[in-house]
């Protein structure tokens, strides 16, 4: 296993790179960050792109601490050439999760910048966890996601000691083929309601902001058996519902006809920044879940079918979603039965250790008490 250095050591390694000056970012850097991502993602043929609003929303979120978790590298002319992101999730304690990300200008690759950035990201995640860890906190997990076709990023992750632990498929379905029709039942004039032919006793409703707390509870319960799901806080949920990409008019709720209780949902988004590169418009199903009590009754199929009708009604050419290749609920088979096909693949890499193991890898000078000669230095898009 590759050792993780102390954060001070990792910062010194960044400073040793010739021709680049490193500093923390501020809100004024957001447009430059977005431009660098756009250039690099076009070069890398990323299936999913980062938009300006994505970065703005991250920066402005009360959960984010970009002045700790982000580092920027500029060349001698002041141009931004590299971004490192060690996104520490401070909202969830069941798992102490750090999302590793970043970008290097394509013209500056091969100089060791990405290697040094990833070392800092790992070191920063360890430093944050050690400084903020409390009794009852879960293990530290540091993860990086990358399209499977980006072999250079795969090699970078593996050299840093990360291992591929899971794969996800992007899937799509053209909307020029017929979508099954669900008869309209005019039960509530303000909020249209649809009967679900194959899911007797269940109705579909428009997304209703007044039921957002109930929707969050359904999401949490429905995803409990999904890999690496550690919960969604009310703040995280609210950020999704107010995101520029979220489309409430495409989102659908499923309720039990007898009790009125929510039993499933399909939440959808529009990632317009992806459309030009992929060559078509697309409605994206962000989350699809059904409570265990109502699975096997066609509810998920009905939710997807209704989502597709809404996408098509808005002029979208395709319906898209992402799925865990090892999803335990048989989701992959369901999507294929509805005409979805695989469009791309994503790998998730994880540093294979918990917090206790990582601490043993940290430089001795960074573990001394404050009274010793050394010092401790606390630190910090889907589908």
What positions do the PLM features span?
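Acyl-donor-binding surface of acyltransferase catalytic domains
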Residues: 1-13, 88-92, 97-199, 347-351
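Core beta-strand residues in small-molecule sensory/regulatory alpha/beta domains
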Residues: 72-75, 255-257
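Short amphipathic alpha-helix that is part of the acyltransferase structural core
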Residues: 2-59, 184-188, 194-232, 360-383
